[in-house]
Each structure stands twice: as C-alpha cells, then as structure tokens.
Amino acid sequence: MALAVRISTLTVAVTAAALLAGCERPPVDAVQRGYRGTGMQHIVNPRTLAEQIPTQQAPVATPVADNSGPRANQVFQNVKVLGHLSVAEFTRQMAAITEWVAPTEGCNYCHTENLADDSKYQKVVSRRMLEMTQKVNTQWTQHVAATGVTCYTCHRGNPVPKEIWFTAVPQNKRADFIGNLDGQNQAAKVVGLTSLPYDPFTTFLKEETNVRVYGTTALPTGTSKADIKQAEKTYGLMMHFSGALGVNCTYCHNTNGFGSWDNAAPQRATAWYGIRMARDLNNNFMEGLTKTFPAHRLGPTGDVAKINCSTCHQGAYKPLYGAQMAKDYPGLKPAPAAAAASAVEAAPVDAAASAAPVATVATAAK
C-alpha cells in the first residue's frame, strides 16, 4: 500500500513538473496599457529582459563625413546605389556595412581585389538589400516611422541574419497509415510550440491572404469565408508576433473585442502595415534573388530566405528599442531625385493603405 502511495505521489509530481515546464516562474512585471480592470496589461519577465538588453544595443555611429567634393560614382566604377554620396561619406558607409554585416570576414566578404567586380554573389545581394533598405526608409514609414532601418537592424554582425524563414517541407506521406498532418500538430517553435499550423509565413507574409477571422456578431451570419484551418493559421501568426516582439495579445488588441479597430491600440495599425511591408520585401526583393544565391544558401525546398517580424525585432517590441541609427547614414535613403519620384509613384497606394486599418470591415484580426 505504501509503495502504491509513493508511486502515485511520484507520478503526480512528475506530471505537475511536466505541465509547469512551459511556464515562466514568478515574479513578472505588468504594465497597464489601457483602462483599469480591462486586462489591458503588458507582461514583462525581468529576467528575460535583462538577458535581452545587451543584444538590442545599437553600435555607436561615426561622425557623418564631409558631403562636398565629387560623387562616389564619379570616382569609383560600378557604384549603382550609393553613387550620390560624396567619396568620404561613401567610404564611411562601406566601413559601417562591413562592421554591421561581416566584421570578421571584412571587405573581402563581398569584394575581390577589383572593387568594381560583381563576381561574388554577396555583392549582388548586398546591392539589392541596400535598395530594399532605402525603400523601407522612404516608402514604409507607416511601419518604421522616422526611426527607419539599417543593415544592422537585421544582421547584428552576422553575414546571414539569424531570424529568417523558408517554406516548410511538405509531409512525407510514403505510407498511408501515418495520416495527413495537414501542416500542423508538430509543436513548432515558430508558433510557440503549439499544434497550430507551423508555416503561417507562406500564407500571410508571402501570399496576399486575408488575416481576418474574428467575427463581430454573436451568431453566424453566413457571410464569413474563414474556416477553422484559416483561424488556426491566423493564431499561428499571432503566436509568432508575440514571440518576435516579446509582447502579449493586448499590445495590439483590446480583448473586449479583437475585431474592433476603434478600441484597439495604435500598435495594431502599425502591425497592419508591417504585414504588408513583409510581403512587399519578400516578393519584390528576396524572391528575385533566388537564382543569385548558391544552393547552400537556399531552403530545403529550394526557396530563398525570407523576412518575418523576428528578422528585425528579434524579441523586442521595437528593433534595438527604437534606436535611430538610420538618421546618421544618408546613404540608406535614395538620392533626392529618386526619392521624390518614388514618393509620387507610391502616393496612390499609400493613400489607400492609410485608411485601410480603420475603414475596412471591423472583423480584421490584424
């Protein structure tokens, strides 16, 4: 009898330990972000925050160089993106990129002895990434505001950013008895180790799939086309948001009504633009580089590395806690004439997008 009691006690203890293994131990800090008593709180684990702070520090910028004198494209050959800078500022920008992206490898990571040579794929990719950065800093200010981004925002001293994603490998169904997992039930890290669909990125950050699944009526109306699988993918994406930014649901949503834009936090509109920015960058910049990258840089299905929220945020609600690095590097915005042309071309799209978060149907989840 005593042995049975001991075994039962041990079983209960082991089960309890297993159930609590995924929980954070107290204490945690709560920051009120809405009206009292409504649960609008931001939960912060001070121990996790202490570990994160050193990784979110922006490097000190060197003083901006003299902008007088000949332009870089007048002195150097094959300077296609940063040619509008002075020679001094161009040299400063190149030194900064080396420190941000390849501090160990140095200039040779992208260049041969002939600096004008484009034989290294790294140089071709970096040129396109500079154009991408310039676009983000001028045409996606609804998401990055005046803070902008630099190469360091994503790379953090690594030639390949740590936080990237590839299309998930399809299930190998060589034997019918294993069943069809339907892209979920794998406890993937990207969806918080849950059974949710483990590739929400292809659906929402590459394809133009609507994230909206939340209803605003007590009973079904028959007008919603969302099904359970789409709802699960949406929640998978939300789990990614939470981990990527180190926040809980109430950072963007009012839990009184997830579908309400009027009662949501301002960050929800910022996230709405962020979703569309990620799609733009993945489809118009990353996908076009698929054939440029060597095979060992591609994913298991042969696709190119792509961007999600973690690529920039890396666990912080604002990348580098909002450090304004871009303002110190004029080369990370296009030449004035090109910037003006881009702004005029993008104006109709931006005008329509500006109204979208508040003017569309109130069933949006993000």
Curated annotation (Swiss-Prot):
Residues in the signal sequence: 1-22
Post-translational modification: Binds 4 heme groups per subunit.
Subcellular location: Cellular chromatophore membrane
Topology in membrane: Lipid-anchor
Binding site for heme 3: 238, 249, 252-253
InterPro entries, per the entry: Multihaem_cyt_PRC_cyt_su-like, Multihaem_cyt_sf, Photosyn_RC_cyt_c-su
Gene Ontology molecular function: electron transfer activity; heme binding; iron ion binding
Entries under Gene3D superfamilies matching the protein: Photosynthetic Reaction Center, subunit C, domain 2
Residues annotated for heme 1 binding in this entry: 94, 107, 110-111
Lipid sites, type S-diacylglycerol cysteine: 23
Gene Ontology terms: biological process: photosynthesis, light reaction
Keyword tags: Electron transport, Heme, Iron, Lipoprotein, Membrane, Metal-binding, Palmitate, Photosynthesis, Reaction center, Repeat, Signal, Transport
PROSITE patterns found in the cross-reference section: MULTIHEME_CYTC, PROKAR_LIPOPROTEIN
Binding site for heme 4: 143, 309, 312-313
One of the record's GO cellular component terms: plasma membrane-derived chromatophore membrane
Function according to Swiss-Prot or TrEMBL: The reaction center of purple bacteria contains a tightly bound cytochrome molecule which re-reduces the photo oxidized primary electron donor.
The protein, known as: Photosynthetic reaction center cytochrome c subunit
Organism: Rubrivivax gelatinosus (strain NBRC 100245 / IL144)
